[in-house]
Regions:
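Short, charge-rich patches within N-terminal targeting peptides
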Residues: 4-12
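Bacterial N-terminal signal peptides that target proteins for export
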Residues: 25-37
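Bacterial N-terminal signal peptides
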Residues: 36-46
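N-terminal "domain-start" segment that seeds a small globular fold
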Residues: 46-69
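Short active-site neighborhood of thiol/selenol oxidoreductases, capturing the structured segment around
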Residues: 68-86
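Structural microenvironment flanking redox-active thiols in thiol-disulfide oxidoreductases
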Residues: 89-129, 139-145
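Thiol/disulfide oxidoreductase modules built on the thioredoxin-like
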Residues: 127-132, 139-183
């Protein structure tokens, strides 16, 4: 009964334009929460750095072994693909166009074939399609593991000049948006 009396009095106070002390505290806390929540979110998001690119080693079809860190200072598109992947094969001419459009501006493309793709198939595909960029076979699967354990193809990563992953694409990217993003990254001071 005592609880009912307090509730009834609180209700009467509100109906007569009065607010109890506990009601004022609640309103104050809500107002502060509404003000601080967006600021805390901005601080958190602003403080988050982009994921660093794994410094994977790769061997290109021409036998050159290199590390991804050797491409630092360039905007890089790393594409994990397979010759048996129809989406990969369908997007390859667009990757070629993208590479050709931006290569003279410090842009690099690296196509890494998955470990299950026979090297001879990859070599034949690259030769028959005159791929103008570096092509590697991830025979050990270590490169795919280094990039968040890539299992689906195509999976593509856009990396800025500082070596940070700025975008990840599962499936074929929207190439108009990709081109705009590459142009933006190339225009940024290093």
């Amino acid at each position: 009964l005592a609880g009912d009396d307090k509730q009834q009095q609180s209700s009467q106070n509100r109906t007569h334009g009065k607010t109890s002390l506990s009601g004022k505290k609640t309103m104050f806390h809500k107002a502060i929460t509404r003000l601080l929540a967006p600021l805390l979110l901005l601080a958190f998001v602003g403080g988050c750095s982009q994921p660093a690119t794994p410094d994977v080693s790769f061997t290109t079809l021409d036998g050159q072994t290199s590390r991804l860190s050797a491409l630092r200072g360039k905007v890089v598109l790393v594409n994990f693909w397979a010759t048996t992947c129809t989406t990969c094969v369908a997007e390859m001419p667009k990757l070629v166009d993208t590479h050709n459009k931006f290569a003279a501006q410090g842009f690099e493309t690296l196509a890494i074939a998955m470990s299950y793709d026979p090297p001879d198939y990859v070599r034949n595909y690259a030769r028959n399609n005159a791929l103008p960029f570096k092509v590697a076979v991830d025979a050990s699967g270590e490169a795919a593991k280094g990039f968040d354990d890539v299992r689906l193809t195509p999976t593509t990563f856009l990396i800025d000049e500082r070596g940070q992953v700025v975008q990840k694409f599962l499936g074929e990217p929207d190439f108009d948006k990709l081109h705009a993003r590459i142009a933006q990254l190339l225009a940024e001071p290093a």
